Amino acid sequence: MKGNLFIITAPSGAGKTSLVRALLDGDEHIKLSVSHTTRKPRPGEEDGVHYHFVEEARFVELLNHGDFLESAQVHGAYYGTSQSTVNSALAEGYDLILEIDWQGAQQVRSLYADAISIFILPPSMEALEQRLNNRAQDSAEVIARRLAAAREEMRHVTEFDYVTINDRFEHALEDLRAIIRSQRLRREKQLIRYQDVVQKLL
C-alpha cells in the first residue's frame, strides 16, 4: 500500500467527527472513507459526504455480496465500510481515515496488519454526558444508552496503537497530526514515496 490506513475510534460525544473534519481541512493528502449506514441523517449531514444513507434491505444486500471491509450494528443502526473504496484510495497513495467503532477496528486490523489505530477519549464521563446533552439530538433515554455503550467501548482502549484525550480540541488535533506525520515518515513509506529519488542516490 502506498497510503496509510488510519482507524479512529471514540465513544459517541468524544469529538471524533469534529477532529477528523479539522484534519481533512488542513491536509489534501488524506481522505475520509465514507461509510454506509442505515441510520437517519442528522441535521446538516449530506448523503455521500458524511455517510451513504441506505435502507436496511440495501445494506443487507451489499453485506451479502461481500462489499464491506467491516460492518457493525451500533445504537440500533448498521454501519459498513466499502472495501473497494479503501483499496483504491490507498493504491493511489492517499492516506485514508476510517471513523469506525472498536468492533470494526478489530475486523480491519485482522485484514490490514499495518493499519494504525487511534482511540480518542473524553476527559471524564461527566464531560462526555455534557457534550451529548449539548448536542440536543437525543432523548435522555438514548443518552443513557450512549453513556453505557461508551463505557463498554472504552474498555477496548488497550487494543489501539495511540491514545489521545480530547480535553482541549487544539491539543487533541495536534496529537492526531503528529501521529499522521510520524507514520508518513516511516522508512518503508518514504522509500515507496521517493523511490525514484532513492534509486538515483544509491
From Swiss-Prot:
Main location: cytoplasm
Enzyme Commission designation: 2.7.4.8
UniProtKB keywords: ATP-binding, Cytoplasm, Kinase, Nucleotide-binding, Transferase
InterPro entries given in the database record: GK/Ca_channel_bsu, Guanylate_kin-like_dom, Guanylate_kinase, Guanylate_kinase_CS, P-loop_NTPase
Catalytic activity: GMP + ATP = GDP + ADP
Domain Guanylate kinase-like: 3-181
Domain of life: Bacteria
Residues reported to bind ATP: 10-17
Cellular component per GO, a single term: cytosol
Record family assignment: Belongs to the guanylate kinase family.
Protein name: Guanylate kinase
